[in-house]
C-alpha cells in the first residue's frame, strides 16, 4: 500500500490547494509541519533539501520512497492536478 505524507505549513495557499485536491480525489495523507527542526533534519537526511512547501513523500509498499517538491507539483504557481495522480500512480478519470 502506498502512503502519502504532506509536508506543509499553516496559511499557505499552495498547501491548502494541494490538500484540497487530495481530499477531493479521496487520497488519504498524513500532514506534517515542515517548519519543525526535526522535520527539516529528516528531509535533509533523506536527500530532500527543498523546504518550500508543500513537499510530499510517497512511501511505496516495498519501503521505497520518493519526494516531490513544490516545483514538481506546481507550474507557474498553479497546481498540476495530473501530477498528483501520477505521483500516486492513479489513472486519470476519463473526460465525458
Regions picked out by a protein language model, each given a short descriptive name:
Residues 7-8, 26-41, 50-51:
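Thiol-based oxidoreductase modules, predominantly thioredoxin-like and allied folds used
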Residues 41-45, 64:
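Short secondary-structure transition/capping segments
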Residues 1-30:
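Local sequence-structure signature of Cys/Sec-based thiol-disulfide redox active-site neighborhoods
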Residues 58-95:
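Non-catalytic, surface beta->alpha helical segment in thiol-disulfide oxidoreductase systems
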Residues 46-57:
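Structural micro-motif
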Amino acid at each position: 500500500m502506498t502512503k502519502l505524507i504532506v509536508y506543509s505549513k499553516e496559511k499557505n495557499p499552495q498547501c491548502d490547494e494541494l490538500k484540497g485536491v487530495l481530499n477531493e480525489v479521496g487520497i488519504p495523507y498524513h500532514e506534517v509541519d515542515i517548519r519543525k527542526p526535526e522535520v527539516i533534519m529528516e528531509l535533509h537526511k533523506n536527500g530532500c533539501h527543498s523546504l518550500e512547501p508543500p513537499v510530499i513523500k510517497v512511501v511505496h509498499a516495498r519501503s521505497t520512497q520518493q519526494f516531490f517538491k513544490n516545483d514538481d507539483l506546481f507550474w507557474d504557481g498553479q497546481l498540476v492536478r495530473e501530477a498528483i495522480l501520477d505521483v500516486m500512480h492513479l489513472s486519470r478519470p476519463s473526460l465525458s
